[in-house]
Amino acid sequence: MTARAIEDLLRELTPQVLGALVRRHGQFEGCEDAVQEAVLAATVQWPAEGVPNNPRGWLVTVASRRLIDQMRSDHARRERESATATEVVPEDVPDTDDTLVLLLLCCHPTLTAASQTALTLRAVGGLTTAEIARAFLVPEATMAARISRAKQRIKAAGSSFSLPDGAEREERLRVVLHVLYLIFNEGYTASSGSELHRADLAHEAIRLARMVHTQLPEDGEVTGLLALMLLTHARREARTTAAGDLVPLDEQDRTQWDRGLIDEGTELVKTSLAGPALGPYQLQAAIAATHADAATAEETNWPQVHALYLILERIAPNPMVTLNRAIALAETEGPSAGLALLSTLDRDERMAGHHRLLSVRAHLLEKTGDTAGAYEHYRRAAKSTASIAEQRYLESRAGRVRA
């Protein structure tokens, strides 16, 4: 097995091993340290000696021994943990994948969205603290403190390492999906910095979504989220020029879209829509599939897109949904209709000064022939975003309408 294949295998197994240890020993931070030591040992031994027949069992055994050694050397907790420390590490490790339970734990409701995201990437994604810090453009020390506080909050909450029942499980799963959605969005369109994409985050979100889908293939929203990610990610190569400038959807070279991802995503959409209920991720995936089905921008089925946004707006009201519906409405009934719908967002404090609202209004004003209004709103939008790639694009649009 090549070094890259071993690296990929370890990345896949790490959350499973961590889940197994947390279930057995119940201490998140100590288990994570022990798993990292076991992974480090594997990166040294496996290339030289070969991958063991049961690599997951090997990692669980080594990590358990490291954790027990750590417990035995901790004199302050010797009495409390003596029973655990004298346990014999089992030769046969149960073949149970606790990744989903670990994900639910990382997305504990007592944590903020930022902490849930960071802890998920660290514990389940296997990214280092430095990698996560770079992805979100914060100092490594800040990210390390955020992750540490998240672990302490989970410990203080006394959460058990088990799947919640009934309604609580559904609610926690929705939080997991939201966190994966946030990770993907930050990777697909970075909210700040010089790059439009952060491919590592987008790829990691898709990998984790696949993992959840493998364990919950019948869940329509899990399927819908994975489909949405695949259909959106399929456009990545066409979204920027060679110089890194943003290319809007209607101007993209669709021959650059990844047809394999589109085909997979479209099949997942069909599967998810056949279920008994519709959720927001399924509807967003259906919208993405409608765009992917059009060979050119002009062939887009805008009435269908608008109808889907209407349903989405009813079941999951959100100003960004209304914003996107305004674009679809402008394509079906004209820019004035879109502008009228946009005006309903002016009273929403969440959208005050938002660059997306300003840029869409600029685009629709440009379509009506109001170049002065379009120029003003493009400039305001450029000043309102922290993304340098988006700033460049919006400034170029402003220059174009003024020329």
Put a short name on every predicted segment:
Residues 1-19, 29, 170-178, 182:
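A short, charge-rich alpha-helical start-of-domain segment used by transcription regulators
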Residues 50, 60-82, 156:
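Arg/Lys-rich amphipathic alpha helix in sigma70-family domain 2
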Residues 225, 229-232, 284, 288, ...:
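"A position-specific structural signal for the A-helix of alpha-solenoid helical repeats
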